[in-house]
């Protein structure tokens, strides 16, 4: 986990942005703590109501923050989309840190409330709530899948936002897990990590799937996807030892069975965070970034 956390936090920085930025916008209050999001506006608007890319950072549900938007891995995607008039949003959420009582369900609820906040204030920020693409990496990929697949009214958190519903028009997941109920999906000969190491993020204790199967199912996008779910793009490395390729294949196979719109791209020679694994990643990282932005653009085009 240390490597995963370091990659997700150490490369983050405040990006240079050509358009206007609106930082540290409080979208909800939890106890005495505000949860914040940043909005990066395009230099040139293409319409009165701009499409949105809503970014959810990774970090194992226990690390990271909205500043990962400015990492060298992510920023090119957002700059490409801003050139086409997208408003780019990066959201922070509560983290599953020891002793704080936060569970993965709280992470889902927070990022859901962030979307509800944007819908509530769509006129203020001149955005189109019907053209919102959700995007995340690793843990953020799972959260993006949950945003796309769970019903708009599910995972209500802030009572002031609960009546506001929003359904993303599409989602993009970079190496996000799809099913916590099947430990075999986390097993790989590439790592000696414990396959069920994320269970305590779901339940708050060391009990596995057998002790609380409903909680594990609830956090698994695999159990939420339906035929009419928003389109989803899955990008996954074939040598990922953190979130194995099996997760993307597993979700794609179910999508094929039920007729849901899921596209999958396997990146060869790529580990987690597109780290090189035995050769040059194919497609390359710049190509992955371009594929990601072009997919989002297609989903909001007439």
Describe the predicted segments one by one.
Residues 48-60:
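Short beta-strand element of the alpha/beta-hydrolase
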Residues 228, 234-236, 240:
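Short beta-strand/loop motif that positions the catalytic acidic residue
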Residues 69-73, 77-78, 84, 89-129, ...:
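Catalytic nucleophile-loop/oxyanion-hole region of alpha/beta-hydrolase
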Residues 281-302:
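Catalytic active-site module of serine/aspartate enzymes centered on a nucleophile-bearing elbow/loop
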């Amino acid at each position: 986990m240390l490597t995963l956390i370091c990659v997700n936090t150490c490369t983050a920085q405040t990006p240079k942005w050509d358009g206007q930025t609106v930082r540290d916008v409080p979208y909800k209050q939890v106890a005495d703590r505000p949860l914040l999001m940043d909005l990066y506006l395009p230099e040139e608007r293409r319409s009165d109501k701009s499409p949105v890319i809503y970014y959810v950072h990774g970090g194992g549900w226990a690390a990271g923050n909205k500043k990962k938007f400015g990492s060298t891995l992510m920023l090119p995607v957002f700059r490409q989309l801003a050139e086409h008039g997208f408003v780019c949003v990066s959201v922070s959420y509560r983290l599953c840190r020891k002793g704080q009582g936060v569970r993965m369900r709280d992470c889902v609820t927070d990022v859901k409330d962030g979307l509800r906040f944007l819908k509530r204030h769509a006129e203020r920020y001149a955005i189109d709530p019907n053209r919102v693409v959700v995007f995340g990496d690793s843990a953020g990929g799972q959260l993006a899948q949950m945003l796309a697949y769970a019903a708009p009214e599910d995972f209500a958190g802030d009572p002031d936002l609960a009546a506001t519903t929003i359904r993303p028009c599409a989602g993009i997941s970079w190496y996000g897990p799809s099913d916590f109920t099947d430990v075999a999906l986390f097993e790989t000969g590439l790592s000696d990590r414990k396959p069920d190491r994320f269970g305590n993020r779901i339940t708050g204790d060391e009990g596995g799937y057998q002790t609380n199967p409903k909680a594990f199912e609830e956090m698994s996008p695999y159990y939420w996807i339906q035929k009419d779910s928003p389109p989803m793009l899955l990008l996954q490395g074939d040598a990922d030892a953190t979130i194995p390729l099996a997760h993307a294949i597993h979700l794609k196979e179910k999508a094929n069975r039920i007729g849901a719109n899921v596209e999958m791209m396997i990146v060869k020679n790529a580990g987690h965070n597109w780290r090189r694994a035995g050769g040059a990643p194919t497609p390359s990282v710049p190509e992955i970034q371009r594929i990601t932005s072009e997919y989002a653009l297609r989903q909001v085009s007439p």
